[in-house]
Amino acid sequence: MRWLSFRYDLSSDEGWSSSPWIELGDWTRFLYNNYDFYEGNKVHWEHFYVGIFRCNQVLANVPAIEMDEVQKNQLLAQASFLRALWYFQINLLWEKGTLVLEPQNADYIPKDASEQEIWDQIEKDLTFAMENLPEAWDAADLGRATKGAAKALLGKAYMQQHKYD
């Protein structure tokens, strides 16, 4: 994730590079065709799907745990929020990916999902998160996803899809 804001900055109107590092200049021109570029594509892709894998583990296993239902739903909502965040980044950078919604074993080969299928899942995850996350956390849990964070990310997802109504 440390490269992500840098990557978006380079792709913005303010992005510019005179670096001899070719890929940095490519990013300023929205050229992402060096798929061997370790920091640019491989690291982000892997880290996003590791995050999604972890969220799927929570979403698959926490429902079976006996605990307070409000706390359980908050945990599930946090995992849903984070999974939506990872898929949001995937759609922004690559406009498609694989939609993996359950834990899988090592021989699983996922199928490509369309950009719209991923947006639909983002909306579903964020709607659940908004319904179950608190408005705020106490100081010990500061930094966790909140209802406002889920609303804001859902708003960004709508804007990316040109859903203004």
Each predicted region: which residue ranges?
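Outer-membrane beta-barrel proteins
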Residues: 139-146, 164-165
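Conserved, well-structured interaction surfaces
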Residues: 21-94, 108-117, 126-142
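Acidic, glycine-rich segments characteristic of secretory precursors and extracytoplasmic regions
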Residues: 1-15, 57, 116
